[in-house]
Design a protein with these regions (language model features):
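Short alpha-helical
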Residues: 89-90, 115-116, 135, 238-239, ...
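Anion (oxyanion) recognition and catalysis
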Residues: 100, 122, 141, 249, ...
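Active-site phosphate-binding/coordination module
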Residues: 99-123, 127-134, 148, 252, ...
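Short beta-strand/turn micro-motifs composed of small residues
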Residues: 22, 85, 130-131, 234, ...
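Asp-based, Mg2+/Mn2+-dependent phosphohydrolase catalytic module
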Residues: 3-16, 134-165, 169-196, 208, ...
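Alpha-helical substrate-recognition element adjacent to the catalytic core
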Residues: 3-115, 159, 168-260
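Glycine-centered loop/turn motif at secondary-structure junctions
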Residues: 71, 103, 125, 144-146, ...
Length: 308
């Protein structure tokens, strides 16, 4: 395993840190087919033979590009993107050639030679981990990090220069405590509990910390000229909205838009919001959303537990 950037300044405590896999950042579908069909050595040889060929952007590329652009807007480095890859440094050279080609300010990386990179997330001070490898994402979530599996699909690049991120509520920003009541007792039991606990803040979910860090970054821009916009897109509706609003108020976290859809299909609303990425715990919601926006599946909570 080799870590790049180790001689650079070590303090990244004041930055929002995104760790991203090479397959989430770039389109490595052709080389991945070689790996699946012919094994590691054939993959290595393929990458070396093609290392001067620039990779096409992957599903999370626009998100990374917009995040890094915030540094120039602020005049200082407040966002750090780190490449964490199952490649070796040898096979990863093509990825760094592509990073250089696109002018992405990514200098730190961990190439772990076929193993999961998640053990290095803490050392890098990671706020969010994005990967196409579901097992790595689950391991990161279990270790307490915000993490999502980036799904490939028909999503087109969001046209706006504004960075737009959409979040589901239960099991993403919040814990899955309410979702468990809904799945065990149905809608009536869920709504009764939410009315009863309207003034009792929900526990935080895996993305609470990332949302808080993003919110702090937003506050560094003028209110009328902030290039970051966030949205809560939830299947909740009244009367279950009050507890959500009061919880966010208790946490001192602001969301720019809140959509309480009462069970309506989310994909049309995510497309209207023009999200650069949407995070949701429910696989069914993600399958629909991936056709219109870049989508991160958060395999957390009761909806992702194996049936008993």
């Amino acid at each position: 395993m080799r870590v790049l950037g180790e001689n650079m300044a070590k303090n990244i405590d004041d930055k929002l840190v995104l760790a991203i896999s090479s397959r989430a950042l770039f389109d490595l579908s052709e080389s991945h087919k070689v790996y699946l069909s012919s094994g590691v050595e054939a993959y290595r040889q393929y990458q070396i033979e093609h290392e001067d060929e620039i990779l096409a952007p992957g599903d999370a590329f626009p998100l990374v590009e917009k995040l890094l652009s915030l540094n120039s807007r602020l005049g200082r480095a407040r966002v750090e993107v780190i490449l964490v890859s199952r490649n070796s440094a040898d096979t990863g050279l093509r990825v760094f050639n592509s990073i250089h080609h696109y002018g992405l300010a990514i200098s730190r990386a961990a190439f772990v030679g076929g193993r999961s990179p998640y053990p290095y997330l803490k050392a890098f001070g990671c706020d969010l981990f994005l990967s196409t490898h579901a097992e790595d994402v689950r391991a990161a979530l279990d270790a307490g990090f915000a993490a999502a599996t980036i799904l490939s699909g028909g999503a087109s690049r969001a046209a706006s220069d504004e960075l737009r991120i959409a979040f589901d509520g239960d099991a993403v920003i919040f814990s899955d405590e309410s979702e468990r009541i809904y799945q065990s007792g149905g809608l009536e039991a869920f709504q009764a509990k939410e009315r009863e606990a309207a003034r009792e803040p929900l526990r935080g979910g895996p993305f609470k910390g990332f949302l808080a860090a993003l919110n702090l970054l937003q506050r560094e821009f003028p209110d009328d000229d902030c290039p970051i916009r966030t949205a809560l897109v939830t299947a909740r509706s009244a009367p279950a909205h009050e507890r959500v609003i009061r919880t966010l108020r208790e946490w001192d976290i602001r969301l720019d838009e809140s959509l309480f859809l009462g069970g309506l299909t989310k994909s049309a609303f995510l497309e209207a919001f023009a999200a650069d990425v949407s995070f949701d715990d429910q696989a069914g919601h993600c399958e629909l959303a991936r056709e219109v926006v870049a989508t991160g599946h958060v395999p957390h909570g009761i909806s992702n537990e194996p049936p008993i």
